[in-house]
């Protein structure tokens, strides 16, 4: 099973990005949380129960050196940067990408805590 999970809207400043999306859509995004060790934090705008727009930005509370947050901080432009699919078999997705000459990194474990204290965990493949 493969389906669209979310779109990533990258911004150099999360509050500014939330304001931009609110002005574009008329819908106010909600705070998501921080991605420890990745240098990012996010806000979310739901499309449905399991599809959303992620507004992702550098996390000023983290050391950004060598992280995705550092890359976002260096780019002053906001915009749609990536999309993500959900799958119950990321290894198969990685293999399909490799067969199509698309470079894929290793699958990594990710986690964050929501503002209301719920722990979330998932696997990620770039």
Regions found by a protein language model. Give the residues of each.
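Short acidic, gly/pro-rich beta-turn/loop elements at beta-sheet edges
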Residues: 19, 55, 65, 93-95
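Conserved short beta-strand elements that form part of the metal-binding/catalytic scaffold
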Residues: 27-71, 118-126
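Vicinal oxygen chelate
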Residues: 3-13, 41-48, 53, 67-126
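An N-terminus-focused feature that recognizes amino-terminal "leader" regions
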Residues: 1-44
């Amino acid at each position: 099973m493969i389906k669209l999970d979310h779109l990533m809207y990258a911004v150099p400043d999360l509050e500014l990005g939330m304001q931009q999306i609110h002005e574009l859509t008329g819908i106010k995004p909600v705070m998501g949380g921080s991605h420890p060790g990745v240098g990012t934090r996010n806000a979310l705008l739901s499309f449905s129960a399991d599809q959303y727009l992620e507004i992702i930005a550098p996390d000023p509370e983290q050391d950004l050196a060598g992280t995705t947050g550092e890359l976002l901080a260096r780019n002053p432009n906001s915009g749609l940067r990536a999309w993500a699919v959900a799958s119950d078999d990321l290894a198969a997705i990685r293999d399909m990408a490799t067969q199509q000459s698309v470079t894929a990194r290793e699958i990594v474990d990710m986690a964050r805590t929501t503002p209301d204290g719920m722990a979330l965990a998932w696997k990620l493949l770039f």
